Amino acid sequence: MARYCGPKNRIARRFGANIFGRGRNPLLRKPNPPGQHGMQRKKKSDYGLQLEEKQKLKACYGMILEKQLVKAYKEVVHKQGNVAQMFLEKFECRLDNIVYRLGFAKTIFAAQQLVSHGHVLVNGKKVDRRSFFVRPGMQISLKEKSRRLAIVTESLENKDQSSLPAYLSLDKAAFKGELVVSPELDQISSQLPLPVNVSVICEFLSHRT
């Protein structure tokens, strides 16, 4: 599966937030946006704002691809209910993101590696597809050998149980978590490292499909 291999710190500086949850905050060394004229903020057009919100959402979930955005929008646009919520849920409930939210990895990129390398189980069966959609009631756990990985033990040691989203449950001792219910829009938004206008993104994608 294709993945982003570009400069992550540059993206964090662009949006002014430690968006990937890295231990070393890249903004402490270089707080300004990248580029020769990083301090200068030009007024953006509506189209420019839509593009920026789209890029923010991609970054929040580990640099997801454009085609994944389009596919997710197509899957929810004709369904009854809150399109923005259903659209955002498509990314919040990705397996790699759930692994990250549970605290099995310190960053979304580390979570992606855990999944891709076959360390993660869904209802007791190995799933190595990062974009796998986790549904309520599904249990996420780690292989017994994988539980001794340094990236896992260090992350769980620092995981504050109070920071766990209300739609998840976690048994640290068993290295097991569960998606209890489908997350609401406001619950998902509170977990993002920076505010994202999902409605603007949906409006942008409506002209692309």
Swiss-Prot record:
GO terms for cellular component: small ribosomal subunit. Coiled coil: none annotated. Gene3D superfamilies: Ribosomal Protein S4 Delta 41, Chain A, domain 1, RNA-binding S4 domain. Keywords: Ribonucleoprotein, Ribosomal protein, RNA-binding, rRNA-binding. It comes from the Bacteria. One of its GO terms (molecular function) is structural constituent of ribosome. Residues 22-45 are annotated as: Disordered. Residues 93-154 form the S4 RNA-binding domain. PANTHER family: 30S 40S RIBOSOMAL PROTEIN, SMALL RIBOSOMAL SUBUNIT PROTEIN US4M. One of the primary rRNA binding proteins, it binds directly to 16S rRNA where it nucleates assembly of the body of the 30S subunit. Part of the 30S ribosomal subunit. Contacts protein S5. The interaction surface between S4 and S5 is involved in control of translational fidelity. Belongs to the universal ribosomal protein uS4 family. This is Small ribosomal subunit protein uS4. The gene is rpsD.
